Amino acid sequence: MTQKIRTRFAPSPTGFIHLGNIRSALYPWAFARATGGDFILRIEDTDVERSSQAAVDVIIEGMRWLGLDHDEGPFYQMQRMDRYKAVLAEMQAAGQVYPCYMSVAELDALREKQMAAKEKPRYDGTWRPEPGKTLPPIPAGVQPVLRFKNPQGGSVVWDDKVKGRIEISNDELDDLVIARPDGTPTYNFCVVVDDIDMAITHVIRGDDHVNNTPRQINIFRALGKDVPVYAHLPTVLNEQGEKMSKRNGAKPVTQYAAEGYLPDAMVNYLARLGWSHGDDEIFSREQFLKWFNLDHLGKSAAQFDEAKLRWVNAQHLKATADDKLAELVQPFLAARGVGLDTARMVGGCGLFKDRCSTLVELADWLQLLVTGGQPSAQDISTHVTEAVRPALGKLADALVACEWSKAAIAAAIKQVLAETGLKMPQLAMAVRVLVMGTPQTPSLDAILELMKREDVISRLKI
């Protein structure tokens, strides 16, 4: 029977989650969904001083907004300490770990000596028990760390789904600290126990973890467990070519929601930020999941481009049904205290969406249907001329009695043009400036139909 795919996203809740982080959630989520597998959310919160529940909430909120639903979790490492300590005890009984009493000062002195000799700084195995070896006397009052007995000789080899075959000599790896003096386990050990207990089959994560992988593989093997498949994703760079980070100006994922980006557009953009399906640039979530596999993950660092993100978002806005857009934009209007009935909101979405890159821009247009805009002095002087003013009064009078429909409004405009001899652009530009605050709008009769009759008439009577 084919083994069920199980992937995970395991962030540390030490700050907000940005686009580089969330891409490391998108791909394992997509792989699980594309293969009928399970996606697990795990919170690696062992850094107690820096971790916070607020950061966890932001992570979950960002994933929920993007629709990256998890099948199991969230699991918290701090709630699994008893399990880690039980496995540590088993390994200690099997002679796979040992206590090390070397002090921080002794380790620092060792590193300085190695660096002076142009050697790689590493633990030298002073306290590693070996047949026939005499260990130093145990110092009084010192709580030891526990170190993992890394294999000596040979190498660790794995076929990375992004980077290809990777081989690391065990001679390059020292004996890893897997428990601190107070008994709390360290990151690399906890990760392995979690991946075993949660039956993770594929670890898809950033390539800043590549150096951890051989150490983790050796712990898997010491515990007699199968090693998962690894895929280490290249770094996401910001627009300046630096690694994306809070320090370098990255924004929280949730800020993009507030700026009016669509979740499916963000998934589309992030998917392309390290994966490809031929030349396809715009695709739905369903298409992405149909196409996604690990074979087309990029090997080079991807660079974030906000202008490209806005373009992708604009394409998704245009493709979204008007009634769905109305649902999405309504909270943006409500936050401004702007009330617009559903029918007019749906109609406005159809009129304006081709002019917008975000929901915020769409809300800007829809708001004008209610509040009008403040025209510039330049637009007034250019378009609302003495030659046009009489026609504006005639149009206001005609609109008082006519049916409030696009066809009737168009007929009223046509009648005023016939009576005054004006050309359509002369009258239309003036009306747009007065009722919407800008000479650049969609079809005038369609715009006026979506506005309240009394608002239009009052703005035309100057």
From Swiss-Prot:
Subcellular location: Cytoplasm
Function, as annotated: Catalyzes the attachment of glutamate to tRNA(Glu) in a two-step reaction: glutamate is first activated by ATP to form Glu-AMP and then transferred to the acceptor end of tRNA(Glu).
Biological process, per Gene Ontology: glutamyl-tRNA aminoacylation
A Pfam family it matches: tRNA-synt_1c
Biased composition (Basic and acidic residues): 120-131
Reaction(s) catalysed by this chain's protein: tRNA(Glu) + L-glutamate + ATP = L-glutamyl-tRNA(Glu) + AMP + diphosphate
Subunit structure of this chain's protein: Monomer.
EC number of the protein: 6.1.1.17
Entry binding sites for ATP: K246
CC per GO annotation: cytosol
PROSITE patterns: AA_TRNA_LIGASE_I
Annotated stretches, region: Disordered: 120-140
Motif position, 'KMSKS' region: 243-247
Protein family: Belongs to the class-I aminoacyl-tRNA synthetase family. Glutamate--tRNA ligase type 1 subfamily.
Motif 'HIGH' region per UniProt: ranges: 11-21
Name the UniProt record assigns to this protein: Glutamate--tRNA ligase
Record-level Gene Ontology MF annotations: ATP binding; glutamate-tRNA ligase activity; tRNA binding; zinc ion binding
Principal localisation: cytoplasm
InterPro entries tied to this protein: aa-tRNA-synth_I_cd-bd, aa-tRNA-synth_I_codon-bd_sub2, aa-tRNA-synth_I_CS, aa_tRNA-synth_I_cd-bd_sf, Glu-tRNA-ligase_bac/mito, Glu/Gln-tRNA-synth, Glu/Gln-tRNA-synth_Ib_cat-dom, GluQ/Sye
Source organism of the structure: Polaromonas sp. (strain JS666 / ATCC BAA-500)
